[in-house]
From Swiss-Prot:
High-level lineage: Eukaryota, Metazoa, Chordata, Craniata, Vertebrata
Recorded family membership: Belongs to the krueppel C2H2-type zinc-finger protein family.
Molecular function in Gene Ontology: DNA-binding transcription repressor activity, RNA polymerase II-specific; RNA polymerase II cis-regulatory region sequence-specific DNA binding; sequence-specific DNA binding; transcription cis-regulatory region binding; zinc ion binding
Source organism, top-level taxon: Eukaryota
GO cellular component: cytosol; nucleoplasm
Protein name per the record: Fez family zinc finger protein 1
Amino acid sequence: MDSSCLNATTKMLATAPARGNVMSTSKPLAFSIERIMARTPEPKALPVPHFLQGAVPKGDPKHSLHLNSSIPCMIPFVPVAYDTNSKAGVNGSEPRKASLEVPAPPAVAPSAPAFSCSDLLNCALSLKGDLARDALPLQQYKLVRPRVVNHSSFHAMGALCYLNRGDGPCHPAASVNIHPVASYFLSSPLHPQPKTYLAERNKLVVPAVEKLPSGVAFKDLSQAQLQHYMKESAQLLSEKIAFKTSDFSRGSPNAKPKVFTCEVCGKVFNAHYNLTRHMPVHTGARPFVCKVCGKGFRQASTLCRHKIIHTQEKPHKCNQCGKAFNRSSTLNTHTRIHAGYKPFVCEFCGKGFHQKGNYKNHKLTHSGEKQFKCNICNKAFHQVYNLTFHMHTHNDKKPFTCPTCGKGFCRNFDLKKHVRKLHDSSLGLTRTPTGEPSSDPPPQLQQPPPAPLPPLQPTLPPPGPLPSGLHQGHQ
């Protein structure tokens, strides 16, 4: 047998209990539960505020809480001072300790009424009169950074604690569900109808006031209610407790600005990238050029949409008239024509439009200002595309040619009107619902049959004496 196995067997026999007649010598254990528990360090806790020191009467915490065991309450807030004069947050660092000034509690009048928390939270914490009302001027404090704090150092706080966070001014004595210790963790003044935060261990439950009334113990809630409150707490914490970092950073002098303004037109953007995309509107730069037709665009996305025109693909087809389009957005706009839907209405004349672009161009006609002027003949126009078509008259550029007669036009609209009026009528062509010409002859209207003519009557000579020649011949 190996020596290592022999040593292990010897140790096992030495520590094993006596069985039957076999006697073994017991050795003292190298560890003990008492020594392990004695070496367990106590959790570090924040010092108790001086206005709470001595306010808790001596006694058994378990008896005051009516609990069989003391469960530490974990509150995810740390009290941090906020100096209203210098607007500088204090988190306990040495250079900023000077602005953390907790005023001393005023003298308690002998006849002042006592405020006891034993009926609310069973923590046996009592404050008297003005001390309970003015123990902490909440307007001078503001929450800067949340942190999980083991507040077992507060005497007999127990497993149940209510945190109150509101938006309006209210003294702790004016609302029955406000705890003076919890007020120390507030970030804003209290409200007469506040939201209640139920904290038990590391689980934070944020129910609404109407769903969980004040004074309800944690043990009285069902498991379904707790799960429901836990789900609701996630959104509320992210919105309201997650915690004013934007407000705090906005007040910092070193915070980066979140507003970017165009120096030319004054338009505001929330990102520098959007401002960069906007600047070509003023500079006229069109860095994105189509390789097929050479047309330039300010944005790459506009160029991508333009490339579909050259593919001659029109996958989006109208179900009513059969007309096809390159983009689905164009089809959606086209369907407004069949539905008679004109969402863009002119404020001046009441005329409606299917498209927003046509609506904007129409409004320029009411302004009376023609800011687009021709450099050659000084003719002015309301809209820029009218000036573009007008420039073709000076350079004799007519890109749209009639395939029948060869006549050129500056606009495609004029070409279609020319074909519809001249060639379709002369060739007997009609337009189908899709807009394509058809060789079928146009239907002829049925005319009523002509009225019957009256019968012809023979014409007789008028009565009178016959001529002499005719009279003699008969004789």
